[in-house]
Amino acid sequence: MEPGALNSRVEMANFIEVNSIEKLEKLFEESNEKPVVLFKHSVTCPISSGVYYEVSEVETDVNLVIVQKARDISNEIANKTGIRHESPQAIVLKNGKAVYHASHYDITAEDIQRVESGE
């Protein structure tokens, strides 16, 4: 094993920043065709930073809502799903509805991957 190999992490998720209500609306529509992963992230929260690395192991697109820059989007997610805002928070949408949600250290890449892949 090469030196430092144990500390290296491979980021597999493709993070896509959600920066408009219009983009969010499109994601809800896309969830009718395939599962959509949303991740609410606080850039000032150490817990959120740790969970970001966990979510980076998901092998799919992860739609990133940076709560400091997109409070309106975060609030709209809460309104549309009925799930109280938290950060960090992961939500998987299918057919316009949340089929999975977790916050803080309850968020795992394994759970997101399982729900996203339909297992």
Ranges and model annotations:
Residues 94-119:
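Non-catalytic, surface beta->alpha helical segment in thiol-disulfide oxidoreductase systems
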Residues 2-4, 9-32, 119:
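N-terminal leader/targeting and pre-domain segments
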